[in-house]
Each structure stands twice: as structure tokens, then as C-alpha cells.
């Protein structure tokens, strides 16, 4: 995690600022086993995409540049990558913007909301948050800190009006590790299948990576038939998302 030195020596920056030591997580984030820092709002954002639109969403997520949280590519190129038509790409991108998953940066470039998924140190994450807010046309006027790694004067997102709020948020940071294989595992799932999967993930025991509950319980919550739930669970097992330990007990991968 990042650590901090406060205050800055006189004359180096405004007195309301602090020097922030930007400690990178290194290979843990950027190596072959890199994981995303996921907030639970990401799972809710997966709802509402058709099977074809889901392919577009997953293609974007799998090709995000982690240091900038951006996807670069044309509509035509994204359609080719996702193996869908351009109309589907436009529809999916519009939904992603409406759901606050993406914000347009420039023609052919979109930014992934770092409040849903991000990599790197806490300071790097909040820098991305400020950039994302700017992409949405918001005026960023949070506290100011200095990144001691780059010497950059950083204006924080508006939720950090004081340096103390920034410290407190860093100390209380919580997230779920999300590995890249998850994107491939959910690629092409239907809207109903995603709804079932998200319910299971949100209801599981995080300490044991286990969901306990009957198919009937899932059916009632998700508003579908028992047969639909059963088919979805088979899909999840085949995609290596979970295994069945015994009736009503599923171990999440």
C-alpha cells in the first residue's frame, strides 16, 4: 500500500497539500498474474446486456490499458474483435456509458470507470478517478497532493476535499481481487444467466468462496424458472466458474 509524508517542506507546494509516496504493487498487478481491484458496483453494472452486447463489453474489458484504464479502437475494429455487427457495438457502448462503466475520452478512445475496476496503488487509482470525472465534464476540485514518484501535483477527486479524507480512504480501502480469466468465463452469457451469476457472487460466503442455497431460492430471487437456473448452473460449471460440492452447495473458483 502507499504510505505518506505530511506536511511538505515550506515553499514546495500549497500548505493544504501533502507529499504522497506512490508505492507500486509491481508484478502483483502488472505481471502475468495481474488482478483488478473490483468494487461490488461492477457486478451490478453487468445487468442489462444482451448476449451479443455482452461480447462487446467483455472485449473492451479484456483490452483495457491498465495504467490509463482506457480502451483504444474504432467501432469497426471492436465489431471485428467481438465478432458482432457495428450496430451491436454502438448499442453496447451506449449502454456502458449509461451505466457509468465507460466515458468517452476522444474519438476511438473510452475510459473504464476506475471506481468499478482499477489497478495500481491507491494514489494511482484516485488519479484515474479524477481523470474519469474530467472525461464526464465534471470540474475536479478536491485536495492537492504531490506524487513523490513523479513530482506531479495531483488534484484529487471531489470526494477527497481534504488530505485527511484521502488518508482515511486509503487506510480503509477494500476491494475484491478479480482475475482476467473471469472476463472470458462470462463472455457470451445471456442477460438471465448473468443475473443468476451476479446473485450468487453477491450472496456467497467470501471467506469460504461458497454459495449455499437451493435452485428454488435462486429462481425466486431472479424471477426465472427452475429449469433456467439449472441450465445456468451447468454453464457456470462448464466455464469453470464454480463446482458443485453437494446439493445446494457450490464452491466458487
Set out the residue ranges of the language-model regions.
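Winged helix-turn-helix DNA-binding recognition segment
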Residues: 47-52, 63-119, 191-192, 203-253
Amino acid at each position: 500500500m502507499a504510505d505518506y509524508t505530511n506536511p511538505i517542506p515550506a515553499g514546495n507546494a500549497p500548505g493544504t497539500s501533502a507529499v504522497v509516496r506512490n508505492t507500486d504493487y509491481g508484478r502483483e498487478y502488472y505481471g502475468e498474474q495481474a488482478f483488478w481491484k473490483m468494487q461490488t458496483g461492477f457486478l451490478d453494472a453487468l445487468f442489462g446486456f444482451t448476449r451479443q452486447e455482452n461480447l462487446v463489453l467483455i472485449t473492451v474489458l479484456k483490452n483495457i490499458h491498465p495504467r490509463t484504464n482506457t480502451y483504444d479502437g474504432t467501432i469497426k475494429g471492436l465489431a471485428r474483435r467481438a465478432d458482432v455487427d457495428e450496430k451491436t457495438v454502438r448499442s453496447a457502448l451506449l449502454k456502458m456509458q449509461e451505466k457509468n462503466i465507460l466515458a468517452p475520452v476522444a474519438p476511438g478512445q473510452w475510459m473504464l470507470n476506475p471506481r468499478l475496476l482499477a489497478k495500481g496503488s491507491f494514489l494511482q487509482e484516485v488519479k484515474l478517478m479524477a481523470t474519469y470525472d474530467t472525461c464526464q465534464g465534471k470540474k475536479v476540485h478536491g485536495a492537492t497532493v504531490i506524487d513523490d514518484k513523479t513530482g506531479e501535483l495531483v488534484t484529487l477527486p471531489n470526494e477527497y476535499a481534504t488530505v485527511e479524507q484521502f488518508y482515511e480512504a486509503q487506510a480503509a480501502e477494500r476491494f475484491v481481487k478479480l482475475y482476467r480469466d473471469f472476463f472470458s468465463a462470462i463472455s457470451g452469457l445471456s442477460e438471465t444467466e448473468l443475473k443468476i451469476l451476479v446473485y450468487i457472487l453477491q450472496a456467497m460466503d467470501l471467506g469460504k468462496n461458497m454459495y449455499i442455497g437451493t435452485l428454488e431460492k435462486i429462481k425466486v430471487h431472479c424471477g426465472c424458472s427452475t429449469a433456467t437456473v439449472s441450465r445456468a448452473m451447468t454453464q457456470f460449471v462448464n466455464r469453470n466458474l464454480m463446482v458443485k460440492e453437494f446439493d445446494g452447495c457450490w464452491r466458487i473458483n
